[in-house]
C-alpha cells in the first residue's frame, strides 16, 4: 500500500518501521515540529523524524493540519491510506477523506475503554488487568470510529507507563501490519464501538503527581507506576522534596497517621497510608540522581515518625 504516516514518539516509530519492513510504500511522513527537550532545552527531533531521515522518507513537520496548502500536498501524494499513531495533532475531517481508504489509528487501549490522550497511564491508575491495541477507522469523534482489529496483553504488576509503552509499541507495530494485510485481502469487517461502554483517558495533570498519603497504598503504588517516567510522583519530608519511582505495598496494618514513616528497612522506607503502607524503594531528591532508598539514606537522615506532607 502507498501510505502517509503520521506519528511522533517511539511508540509510533515502531509502527512506521514495521510498515516499511513489510514492504509498504511510505510516501510521506508527518511528525510534530522539533521542540525543546532535556536539561539544556535544546530543540530535539521526534523518534519518527529520526527514523524517517534514516530511511529516506519524505517528511513534513507542520504545526497544524488546517492549512489549505498542506491539504493540496496530501492530495498530491495519492495515498491508499493514512496511518496515525500518537501524532499529537488533530486531524480535520477534511484530511480524513483524502486517502482512498481514509485514515486508521493505532490506539493504545481496548476501545471503547480509554478513549483519549493518556490511555496507558489511565489503565494502570484504574488497576486494569489488561490493555491492548485497537486499530480503528478514524471519524469525526475522539477515538470513536469503527474497530478493525483488537489485540490484548496483560498488565504486569510491576508495569510502569514506560514499560507498557514499549510493549504496546511493539504490539501496535505488529497489529497495523496485520490489519493492512487483512484489509488488502478484504477480510476485515469494521465493528461499531459501543458508546455506552466508553471511558475517557484525560491527559495527566501536574496536580495529580503529588502523593496524597490518605489514599490506599495500592492506589498510590498504581499512581507511581502510571507517572513513571513522566512526570513522576513526588512528596516532601523534613523539607526534602523527592520523586518516588518504585514502590510496593505492605499489607500490614499500622497505627501511624497517613504520610508517617513506620519503619526504615533494608527493602525501603515504609510509609503509612490511608489503608496499609507503602514501601519506597527507589527515590530521587530534587536535582539529584535516582537511588535505592538504602543509598538515599546514607546522605539523608530520616527516622520513624517523620511525616511526609500530603497532597490534596
Swiss-Prot record:
One of its GO terms (molecular function) is methionyl-tRNA formyltransferase activity. It catalyses: L-methionyl-tRNA(fMet) + (6R)-10-formyltetrahydrofolate = N-formyl-L-methionyl-tRNA(fMet) + (6S)-5,6,7,8-tetrahydrofolate + H(+). The keyword Nucleotidyltransferase does not apply. CDD domains: FMT_core_Met-tRNA-FMT_N, Met_tRNA_FMT_C. GO terms for cellular component: cytosol. Pfam families: Formyl_trans_C, Formyl_trans_N. Its EC number is 2.1.2.9. (6S)-5,6,7,8-tetrahydrofolate binds at residues 109-112. InterPro entries: Fmt, Formyl_trans_C, Formyl_transf_N, Formyl_transf_N_sf, Formyl_transferase-like_C_sf, Met-tRNA-FMT_C, Met-tRNA-FMT_N. Keywords: Protein biosynthesis, Transferase. Belongs to the Fmt family. NCBIfam families: fmt. Attaches a formyl group to the free amino group of methionyl-tRNA(fMet). The formyl group appears to play a dual role in the initiator identity of N-formylmethionyl-tRNA by promoting its recognition by IF2 and preventing the misappropriation of this tRNA by the elongation apparatus. This is Methionyl-tRNA formyltransferase. The gene is fmt.
Amino acid at each position: 500500500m502507498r501510505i502517509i504516516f503520521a506519528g511522533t514518539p517511539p511508540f509510533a516509530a515502531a509502527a512506521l518501521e514495521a510498515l516499511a519492513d513489510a514492504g509498504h510504500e511510505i510516501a510521506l511522513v508527518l511528525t510534530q515540529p522539533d521542540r525543546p527537550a532535556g536539561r539544556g532545552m535544546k530543540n530535539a527531533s521526534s523518534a519518527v523524524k529520526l527514523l524517517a531521515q534514516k530511511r529516506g522518507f519524505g517528511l513534513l513537520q507542520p504545526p497544524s493540519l488546517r492549512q489549505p496548502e498542506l491539504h493540496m500536498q496530501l492530495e498530491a501524494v495519492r495515498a491508499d491510506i493514512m496511518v496515525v499513531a500518537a501524532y499529537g495533532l488533530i486531524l480535520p475531517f477534511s484530511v480524513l477523506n483524502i486517502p482512498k481508504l481514509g485514515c486508521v489509528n493505532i490506539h493504545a487501549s481496548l476501545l471503547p475503554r480509554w478513549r483519549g490522550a493518556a490511555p496507558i497511564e489511565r489503565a494502570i491508575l484504574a488497576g486494569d488487568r489488561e490493555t491492548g491495541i485497537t486499530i480503528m477507522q478514524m471519524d469525526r469523534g475522539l477515538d470513536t470510529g469503527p474497530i478493525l482489529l483488537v489485540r490484548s496483553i496483560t498488565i504486569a504488576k510491576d508495569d510502569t507507563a514506560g514499560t507498557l509503552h514499549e510493549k504496546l509499541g511493539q504490539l501496535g507495530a505488529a497489529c497495523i501490519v496485520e490489519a493492512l494485510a487483512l484489509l488488502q485481502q478484504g477480510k476485515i469487517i469494521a465493528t461499531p464501538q459501543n458508546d455506552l461502554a466508553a471511558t475517557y483517558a484525560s491527559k495527566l495533570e501536574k496536580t495529580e503527581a503529588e502523593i496524597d498519603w490518605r489514599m490506599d497504598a495500592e492506589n498510590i503504588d498504581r499512581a507511581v507506576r502510571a507517572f513513571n517516567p513522566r512526570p513522576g510522583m513526588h512528596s516532601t519530608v523534613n523539607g526534602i522534596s523527592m520523586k518516588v519511582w518504585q514502590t510496593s505495598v505492605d499489607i500490614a496494618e499500622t497505627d501511624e497517621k497517613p504520610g508517617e514513616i513506620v519503619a526504615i528497612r533494608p527493602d525501603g522506607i515504609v510509609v503509612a497510608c490511608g489503608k496499609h503502607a507503602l514501601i519506597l524503594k527507589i527515590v530521587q531528591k530534587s536535582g539529584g540522581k535516582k537511588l535505592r532508598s538504602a543509598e538515599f539514606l546514607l546522605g539523608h537522615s530520616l527516622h520513624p515518625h517523620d511525616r511526609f506532607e500530603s497532597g490534596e
